[in-house]
Amino acid sequence: MKVGIIGAMEQEVTILKEAMTNCQTVSKAGCTFFSGQINGVDVVLLQSGIGKVAAAVGTTILLDEYQPDVVINTGSAGGFDSSLNLGDVVISTEVRHHDTDVTAFGYEMGQMAGQPAAFKADEKLMDLAEKALAQMENTHAVRGLICTGDAFVCTAERQEFIRKHFPSVIAVEMEASAIAQTCHQFNTPFVVVRAISDVADKESPMSFEEFLPLAAKSSSEMVCKMLELTK
């Protein structure tokens, strides 16, 4: 099995890159691809850049040129579920765009014309994430809907909009729906496994920038454990 792993920022892929053996690096279209092995599993690690367009470009190249069997999207996310705290993990059951609106033509909020309203994560990959979680100490995870948009959600108005239209949302971020849509079009199974770097409506002693390395550590450890369990 070959596993594609996607993170947007350098901080989100550094730990995974350092865990890789026989690493080869290729840069293309503003993306960086690291191919090698982690825990004995063939992987291609993509640092895509931030946002949906960058994620879609990188994922397309990843799927077309490297042809992984499955894709895992890792990194950080903003928590919307009240049980989440900094460093907790979210596992996608489905992913939706929160900044897409063609409802005037009869589509659901968040649904792009010609696409499903939600992109369903792969059941086997979700179960693999749960098994990895069971082997990690002191790690809390929530499984559910993750929503994506090309905006850092930091205002009460935007939070209220997302909660109104996507009431079951557990977390938001800026790449997953583009990755999920691209995987859907390539018929490649995917799952999103991210760690919480900030939580809506909760005060934090640390800023997003300060907590990002810790969130990256948590999500990377989860991905490494998933890879270990694939053997």
Curated annotation (Swiss-Prot):
Give the UniProt keywords, A-Z.
Amino-acid biosynthesis, Hydrolase, Methionine biosynthesis
> Mind telling me what this protein is named?
5'-methylthioadenosine/S-adenosylhomocysteine nucleosidase
Matching SUPFAM superfamilies: Purine and uridine phosphorylases
A Pfam family for this UniProt protein?
PNP_UDP_1
Q: Which organism's genome codes for this protein? A: Vibrio campbellii (strain ATCC BAA-1116)
Family that this chain belongs to: Belongs to the PNP/UDP phosphorylase family. MtnN subfamily.
Read off the lineage from the record.
Bacteria, Pseudomonadati, Pseudomonadota, Gammaproteobacteria, Vibrionales
Where in the sequence is the active site? E12 (proton acceptor), D198 (proton donor)
Q: Name one GO cellular component term.
A: cytosol
Give a yes or no for keyword Cytoplasm in this entry. no
Which pathway does the record list? Amino-acid biosynthesis; L-methionine biosynthesis via salvage pathway; S-methyl-5-thio-alpha-D-ribose 1-phosphate from S-methyl-5'-thioadenosine (hydrolase route): step 1/2
Which amino acids does the record list as binding substrate?
A: G78, V153, M174, E175
Q: Which domain of life is it from?
A: Bacteria
Its gene name is mtnN
